[in-house]
């Protein structure tokens, strides 16, 4: 999946170079301006939810569940695709929780767009091609398996309005937001940049994830 997304965005070499850049330096390379109107935003602007963009037979949600959890078992008859059970150490709270596939239980573990799609839309994604928006919505760089209630609490918030309760994860979290915004040419608002810089000054050697 990662190779395909890099190909779609033309970002391979640039992203590898960015990996050696500190997040604090990288945030200064982002354009700073106010949010654009939400006019025209719909989830469908980023493609149907959880496509199989790498054509491995599994949708993006299951790819990320498989990446982020341990002790995984799969639904009978789905080979190694549909995750039926797994254990997640939630990055946002530090708590260990179980994922059990089912109508009433699947949503307890959700896949968070670290840069929320509506936030992305209002900070430049409305200018991107449909292909790049689909790539962003399915990019492992922008996706984490997390506690569902915290994902819902975050909603479409940026770093100025929401941060993970687990303070030790905040540097990694905002660095990932910076990496996504840099990769897709998105901007940050003044309040968002101030919040990110405040966090990153506590961890000045934090690098960008790729």
What label would you give each PLM region?
Residues 6-8, 30, 82, 90, ...:
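Compositionally biased, low-complexity repeat tracts
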Residues 1-3:
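N-terminal export and membrane-targeting signals
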Residues 5-7, 13-58, 190-194, 201-210:
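N-terminal module-boundary/linker segments of secreted carbohydrate-active enzymes
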Residues 15-18, 29, 34, 41, ...:
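Short, flexible coil/linker segments at or flanking structured domains
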């Amino acid at each position: 999946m990662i190779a395909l997304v890099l190909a779609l965005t033309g970002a391979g070499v640039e992203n590898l170079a960015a990996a050696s850049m500190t997040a604090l330096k990288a945030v200064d390379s982002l354009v700073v301006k106010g949010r654009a109107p939400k006019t025209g935003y719909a989830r469908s602007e980023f493609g149907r939810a959880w496509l199989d963009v790498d054509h491995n037979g599994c949708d993006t949600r299951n790819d990320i569940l498989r990446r982020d959890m341990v002790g995984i078992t799969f639904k009978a008859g789905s080979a190694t695709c549909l995750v039926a059970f797994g254990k997640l150490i939630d990055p946002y709270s530090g708590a260990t929780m179980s994922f059990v596939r089912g109508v009433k239980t699947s949503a307890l573990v959700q896949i968070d767009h670290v840069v929320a799609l509506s936030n992305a839309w209002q900070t430049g994604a409305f200018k991107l091609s449909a292909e790049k928006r689909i790539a962003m919505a399915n990019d492992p760089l922008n996706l984490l398996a997390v506690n569902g209630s915290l994902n819902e609490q975050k909603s479409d918030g940026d770093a100025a309005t929401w941060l993970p309760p687990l303070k030790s994860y905040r540097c990694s979290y905002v660095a990932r937001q910076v990496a996504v915004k840099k990769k897709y040419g998105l901007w940050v608002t003044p309040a968002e940049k101030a919040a990110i810089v405040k966090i990153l000054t506590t961890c000045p050697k934090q690098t960008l994830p790729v």
